[in-house]
Structures are given as C-alpha cells and as structure tokens.
C-alpha cells in the first residue's frame, strides 16, 4: 500500500513535469534533436560524429547527451524545487547539468528522467562531489551522459525494492566514473525498454525492446543490500552495448546478469566476492565477448563449490520459444 501510494503520487508529479517539458522537446525535435521513444535497434537513434567526451568508448560513445544545450546549475541539496537536481533532470530540452554544491541529495521519491538530451556532469561539483541517496534514479529516455556521480539507494522505504540507478532506458546512454551501491534490487541496470506503442510505430500492445547503444565504463557496482535475499549487482544487455573497466564487488549474484540476447561485450572488468552467482544470464541466442576480465573470489565466495570457480553461467532455459538449438 505504501509503495502504491508513493509511486502513484510520484508518477503524477512526473507526468506534470513531463507536460511542461514535452512542448520544448517537440520544438527542439523540429530543430534537429528528434525524440525517438520507439527506438529498438541501434540505427533507430542518430549518433554524434565525435565522442561524448575524450575517453568515451563502446556503444554509447557517440551519445549526444546535452551537447549544445542550455547549462543548468544545481544550487542546493534539496529533494525538489528551484535549484534542485530533480528540477534540472525533469526540465525539457537539451541541457548540461552542473553543480556548485557538494554533499548528499536525499530523495523522498525516485527521480525519473524523461526528456532526452542531457549530460549530468558530476565532476563539476566542488569538494567530495554529489551523492544521490534514499531513493532510485531512473533514466526513461535516450541520449543521456552521466559522469562522476554516486548513487546510494540505501535501506529506506524497503517496501520499494528497486535499483540505485536504472529505469526504462531507450538508448544512446553513456555512464562513466559512477559509483552505484546499496541497491535493493540491483545497483545499476540497463537492459530493456518497455514501449507503449500509442504512437503507432508498432501494432503490439506489450513490447519489450532492447536498450541500444549503451556504455557503462569505469564504474562501481558494489554491496547490494540483502534485505530481500536479493543482493544483486546488475542486469545489463541490449544491442550495440559495451561494459568495460568496471568493478562488481560483494554482490551475491548478477555480477552482472545478461538481460538480452545478441552480442554481450564485457571487457577489462573486475568481479570480486560473489556468493551464489558470478556472471550469468542471456539465452542460447546470446553471444558473449568476455575478454580480459579478472574474477577474484572473496571471503563470501564458496570455496568447496563449483560456483567459486565459475566465470559465466548462460541461462539457455530462459527462452520462451518452443524449440532449442
């Protein structure tokens, strides 16, 4: 009941913010920044000609983010209101979010990013930077760049069991130098896009499309909370996606779990101290490029069980088809 009430209220607030943002999004679409909510293949989303920033790699490296848009400065640590991080995220139009404050932003409800073309530049914060705590941060759009941020979901409102950083992402997503911990479902997950086909692009009423053109690099997913016997690291996947130079540490499972078929690129990562699952998921159509990763058992890893030596466990039985190959 608490969860339903909170999410009903937050969805209403998010819808109100989206109603204000949408005219700006549509205006900019006519000026060359299209809003493509129905994207389900990598080529559905235009990409930039130069990387999002020096050092960007992988499928999301050509995300536009907020390039060329307005600069919005976060001036306080409030949950909502003028100058807040939430208000900047919910604003319409291409935008680059910078900070002149440092500290912990304690959320009372999830932040839902619905307007595309945004760069969140956590490295602009002074001091020890910015931490988003107490609730989830959701990306429900495309062309998003998030750098140098900390997401600490934490054991608050335990009846709302969700990720520290996740959402319903469409594509052109670049995550770099972020730290995601204390999730109640997973710490950070990007793998699918649930699409409402009201725009008429598809006929189906219930579509699960891949997230496309995604990179997570130089990022930490660690110490998921075991409140529900569900201390999991990540579910990742999609089309034209890459996950490199990341650390998964002290999560019982899903380090990470592969949440889509096709090609899964997993390179130069470290996985430490898993319990009953290291890396897993996908199905018999998945193709895994797992290159130069370091798996190190820790104090919680079983020493006398095959899971302690396991690198990957594909889940062939997940397929809903009536045949196997």
Positions of predicted regions on the chain:
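Extracellular beta-rich repeat passengers
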Residues: 1-27, 34-37, 41, 258-325
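Extracellular "leader-to-stem" segments immediately downstream of a signal peptide or signal-anchor
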Residues: 1-78, 82-96, 106
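Short aromatic-glycine motifs in intrinsically disordered, low-complexity regions
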Residues: 58-64, 109, 165-167, 282, ...
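Conserved beta-strand positions that form and line the central face of beta-propeller blades
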Residues: 73, 164, 255
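Acidic glycine-/aspartate-rich tracts in secreted/extracellular proteins
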Residues: 78-79, 102-104, 124-126, 298-301
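Extracellular beta-strand-rich solenoid/capping regions of secreted or surface-exposed proteins
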Residues: 86-93, 104-119, 130-147, 153-170
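Right-handed parallel beta-helix
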Residues: 117, 122, 126, 142-153, ...
